[in-house]
Amino acid sequence: MKRLITVMTLLLAMPVQAEVQTKTVEYEHDGEKLTGHLYWDDAKKGNGPGVMVIHAWWGLNDYAKTRARMLAEEGYVAFAADMYGTGKVTDKPAQAKEWMLEVTADVDGWQERAALGLEQLKKSGLVDPQRMAAIGYCFGGGTILQMAYSGTEAKAVVGYHASLPAAPESVKGKIGTKVMMFHGHGDKFVAPEVVSNFQNKLEEADADWEMVIFGGDVRHSFTNPDAAKYGIENLKYDADADAASWQRTLELFKQTL
């Protein structure tokens, strides 16, 4: 009887769960019109922590938006940023590569566009600017690293099956954000020597970093349940690695935000 009363009391005390709200945000960088998407739970009162999501090289597709929604369901204000331009989404590797190279060819511009995305999150009026982070997938993982190298306001950056641009010597002692990366041992897009160099350069830069490498046949796009639809052998979903990386990410945000 005591247990029943306790459970009933808890149920009565639980607030009505609000639905995640969403808003389209239009902005511009270097003549390119960009369209991002903001997600938040309006049951949350006051300015809280915010997380920017950077898409993979396919563009700002439903997968990136889904991750932003998942963050909102966890109580974060999330912004799915656009790094390519309004409507630039594809499932064709050649087109994806073209758009990606257009952005990454100018590293300063690449960093500026990422910072502008974070600025949209801050300008939402829903976020405490001292409690922001960013996550990114594939190309987006490389993008959040560029944010770290350029002195981002984000307290933490997290990358999944990311390209791994090494920290330049000029940022030694200047990386003020926590860097966390999740990588698959079976990812043939990133050579072992690239991984080693990436780790060494972060260490030389005196960065606060952590890298989780999932062993076995964990490949690129291990977080994406639809990875196989692209028909690329190196893209493969791994439910265990997906769940583990997401859980560790949420733990990190509880610690840093």
Regions found by a protein language model. Give the residues of each.
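N-terminal signal peptide c-region/cleavage motif recognized by signal peptidases
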Residues: A13-Q17
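Serine-hydrolase catalytic machinery in alpha/beta-hydrolase-like enzymes
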Residues: T24-K123, T223-K236
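Short alpha-helix in the alpha/beta-hydrolase fold that links the catalytic acid
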Residues: R67, A191-K201, M211
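Primarily recognizes the serine-hydrolase "nucleophile elbow" in alpha/beta-hydrolase
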Residues: A114-I175
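Short, proline-enriched alpha-helix->beta-strand connector loops that line the catalytic pocket
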Residues: K174-V179, A205-D208
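Short beta-strand/loop motif that positions the catalytic acidic residue
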Residues: M181-H183
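Acidic catalytic loop of the alpha/beta-hydrolase fold
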Residues: G186-V190
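C-terminal catalytic histidine-bearing segment of alpha/beta-hydrolase fold enzymes
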Residues: E203, D208-L257
